[in-house]
Amino acid sequence: MNLLTVTNLSAGYAGKQVIKDISFFVAPKTIVGILGANGCGKTTLIKAIANLLPHTGSCQLDDTYLENASPRQLALLCGYIPQKSGISIDLSLLDVVLMGFNPKLSLLQSPTEQMKKEAFDTLCSVGLGSRKDDNFQQLSEGQKQLCLLARTFVLKRRLLLLDEPESALDFRLRYETMGLLRTYVAKNNAAALVTLHDPSLALNYCDTLLVLSDCGLLGELQPFSTPISKMEPLLSSIYGTISLTTLSTRSGEKRLIMIKEDDAC
């Protein structure tokens, strides 16, 4: 059974259509990467699914149509991480993660001791447990992103929507973050949709890739099963001529590497 089914989704800004008639489904325990050139609608797609933009079409999460969900119900079902945190006040890391429980709390209700324990445990899972009392504003951009990831994890939502989570991360943290996502979706029978700029990261951590171009879905591929001969033309259509090769790590794992060809040759 599909966890998420998106049907004929169209959305845009200020009267301009950015995505049109996009349909796909997402299975449980999977990560779906969204690739495409700047301006093709990656962020628009994520925001439309999160019900943050007016749109036509439908997004069904299990038995719930997200268009019909209340803000609280939507917040319980979906976790959304934008490109910028939106946090401008001084808060401890623990308090930021505790914000993830807000959909479960009434207006004047405080987090329970159990919630505080779960928030701390989740901070530990992303490597920030020792900094729980530090000021969020004093973190590096990469550390802020990890803290926001913990905030999204803590409620164990079924669907995570992440807009360029790797953009502020260094090489090591990019791969650690995708590893954390993979662990989360497997453990919680959940799924994640992720917009990415790094195709090599997407090729090695995403179960499915949606390739966007000119308002629509250009194609889908499964990096772990689609033949390289079929992936190369699709990826070349958005990145220019590329070639893919497979390398083995020291532990014997296979990795896909994308190489940009010199268009001048």
Residue ranges and their predicted role:
Residues 35-37:
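The feature captures the beta-strand-to-loop junction immediately N-terminal to the Walker
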Residues 160-164:
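Catalytic Walker B motif of ABC-type/P-loop ATPase nucleotide-binding domains
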Residues 50:
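Helix-to-loop junction immediately C-terminal to a conserved catalytic motif
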Residues 98, 113-131, 156:
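Conserved ABC ATPase "signature" region
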Residues 57-65, 74:
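Conserved ABC transporter NBD signature motif
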Residues 135-139:
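Conserved ABC ATPase signature
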Residues 231-265:
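ABC ATPase nucleotide-binding domains
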